[in-house]
């Protein structure tokens, strides 16, 4: 059993390394789903090294980011410079992506229970393109 686990771990690492290498060579892309105050900085940081699709369901926000404007007012226009990123609200732009990061809100209610509706919606979006 231990040998199986070691082999499985080795295979997972090799696959991760392969995907990472493909991204560094520009042969594959990463997507960040949800471009709020958490997702946008993550997307921009990755986009300084690899191709990124930044996806948000709000077209108005996407249009602002295409013009180097952060709708959350956390980042400046210069933070968008030098980034290889496609901002989109079109699910079809997620089809050629190999790695997905979901960064959507999980607000809590009065009983401190998370509302997973945004997470479930984002998961369904990703499922449509897998």
Pin down the residues of each PLM region.
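Structural/interface elements that position substrates and couple domains in central-metabolism enzymes
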Residues: 1-130
């Amino acid at each position: 059993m231990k040998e199986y686990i070691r082999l499985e771990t080795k295979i997972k690492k090799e696959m991760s390394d392969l995907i990472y290498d493909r991204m560094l060579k520009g042969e594959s892309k990463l997507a960040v789903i949800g471009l709020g105050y958490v997702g946008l900085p993550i997307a921009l940081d990755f986009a300084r090294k690899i191709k990124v699709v930044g996806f948000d369901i709000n077209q108005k926000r996407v249009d602002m980011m295409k013009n180097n404007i952060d709708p959350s007012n956390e980042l400046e226009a210069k933070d968008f410079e030098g980034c290889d990123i496609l901002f989109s609200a079109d699910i079809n732009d997620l089809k050629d992506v190999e790695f997905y990061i979901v960064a959507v809100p999980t607000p809590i209610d009065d009983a401190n229970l998370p509302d997973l509706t945004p997470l479930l919606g984002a998961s369904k979006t990703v499922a449509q393109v897998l």
